[in-house]
From Swiss-Prot:
Pathway recorded for this protein: tRNA modification; tRNA-queuosine biosynthesis
Record keywords, A-Z: Cytoplasm, Queuosine biosynthesis, S-adenosyl-L-methionine, Transferase
Originating species: Bacillus cereus (strain ATCC 14579 / DSM 31 / CCUG 7414 / JCM 2152 / NBRC 15305 / NCIMB 9373 / NCTC 2599 / NRRL B-3711)
Protein name in the entry: S-adenosylmethionine:tRNA ribosyltransferase-isomerase
Family label: Belongs to the QueA family.
EC identifiers of the protein: 2.4.99.17
Amino acid sequence: MDINLFDFHLPEELIAQVPLEDRETSRLMVLDRETGDIEHKHFTDILSYLHEGDCLVLNETKVMPARLHGVKEDTGAHIEVLLLKQEEGDKWETLVKPAKRVKEGTVISFGEGKLKATCTGTADQGGRQLEFSYDGIFYEILDELGEMPLPPYIKETLEDRDRYQTVYAKEIGSAAAPTAGLHFTEELLEKLKQKGVQLAFITLHVGLGTFRPVSADTIEEHHMHAEYYHMSEETAALLNRVKQNGGRIITVGTTSTRTLETIATDHDGKLCAASGWTDIFMYPGYEFKAIDGLITNFHLPKSTLIMLVSAFANRDNVLHAYNEAVKEKYRFFSFGDAMFVASHAKMRNK
């Protein structure tokens, strides 16, 4: 399948550069995945579309301030490091710039020596294995010295770090935010609970591969990056109860979707406690096994994320919705507006 089938025209001015002052004031497009019918709402209207017995699945990963600026100890040359994933102990898989200056044995100093890293291995595309040394607690030092790794299409400086975290972020380990969750406030989540909507939590640590464009000409040639996920016994039991009682499982974001669909695929359609690495790639033709609805942002043209949404809601429906979003000047990407996709979404609005 040609990746150009997932292309659309997006004016640059529609790429949201900063978050809205209030999280829940973003707009919400409601898309019926079967009919393609569209409604234009605001995010707080999600209350009208979720009902007692439904369950929202939220990714409680927390973004690391994963971008570090340091200098080579021997020459003083500036080096930028992006933490991707922790391997063993203080060893990390990273991206460095400029990569040609960092070879095995190179020592990089951050914060006037408060944190040091030695290169212990190299990989393609600027990948380097670094082993860190420090006095104290690594994540406290990282919090002091690191910057939030905003996506490359965001050019503005983020004034408030918390705006690139969900209000329920808990498990540190992501290089990017699960952005569909950024629209929820604690007050909105409380209103949903009061209405009888259940909240279930999983963890999937978002990797930088999320922002890597598909370089292959066809979908089938593309290989997804692997990301770590975890679902507890408590969450699995809750989701199975919801299913048994006729409620809907609504995932917040493509990360929650990937987690549930990975587990269901690996366990004959069942949801159970599980941890591991997933490189699941969902595109048209994939049959969903776990979810009934999806809340997600508006994604990049030709990205694996728009392919996932197209697998769930039909490519023609999704591209029509995206063209409507452009026409109606919705805000796109990480700090942009949201879409709620489900079967008979309009019919469920009470």
